């Protein structure tokens, strides 16, 4: 019993193995989930989803809020100028019976051509992360973290055809994928995204609503 206790106490929370075990297990709860309403099985009190994609000189933000199972999920698509941050376009939508219903479908398809969140198609788990090439691993203790939590940042070079299609690049070309999460935190809060030349090109965050 003493040996087991000592071994557990010696777990290195900053190691790749520990962080991939943690993040892989958590992310696999969500990635993939084709029907957004199924996320209520994981987060019964509700959840929010945010996504950002760089399009030329603009950033396209998609935000969805889900607070009660069985009711339409509501969201917005906004295009902002990346330099001035001024809003250029805004479209509201609902997610009902497994489908997006847009205020202006034609304009929505221009702003959000993939018409889906990453988590609806992308598969992420411990095994996938373990096989990828790790480029960076940063662990920040809560005393030094602006969120007040123990946080971690993992960056990989990995082939993800789903992401490549959204970015409009060759599917065989690796992308720089990053994962930002919290260690020993209440509730699900994860961010994933891609970078090119140290600039974020695609980003998504899922946050569990806690009561």
Where are the regions that the model predicts?
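Bacterial N-terminal signal peptides
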Residues: 1-6
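Flexible, processing/modification-adjacent segments and terminal tails
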Residues: 95-149
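An acidic-aromatic
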Residues: 63-119
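Short, solvent-exposed coil/turn segments at beta-strand boundaries
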Residues: 41-47, 65-74, 94-99, 149, ...
């Amino acid at each position: 019993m003493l040996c087991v206790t000592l071994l557990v106490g010696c777990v290195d929370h900053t190691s790749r193995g520990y962080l991939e075990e943690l993040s892989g297990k958590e992310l696999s709860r969500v990635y993939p989930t084709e029907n957004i309403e199924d996320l209520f099985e994981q987060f019964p009190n509700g959840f929010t989803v945010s996504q950002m994609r760089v399009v030329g000189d603009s950033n396209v933000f998609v935000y969805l809020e889900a607070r009660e199972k069985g009711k339409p999920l509501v969201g917005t698509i906004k295009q902002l100028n990346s330099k001035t941050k001024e809003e250029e376009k805004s479209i509201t939508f609902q997610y009902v019976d497994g489908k997006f219903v847009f205020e202006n479908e034609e304009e929505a398809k221009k702003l959000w051509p993939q018409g889906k969140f990453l988590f609806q198609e992308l598969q992420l788990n411990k095994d996938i992360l373990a096989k990828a090439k790790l480029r960076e691993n940063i662990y920040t203790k809560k005393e030094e973290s602006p969120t007040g939590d123990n946080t971690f940042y993992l960056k990989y070079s990995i082939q993800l055809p789903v992401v490549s299609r959204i970015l409009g690049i060759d599917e065989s070309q690796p992308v720089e994928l990053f994962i930002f999460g919290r260690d020993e935190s209440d509730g699900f809060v994860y961010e994933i995204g891609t970078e090119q030349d140290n600039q974020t090109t695609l980003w998504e965050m899922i946050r569990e609503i806690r009561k």
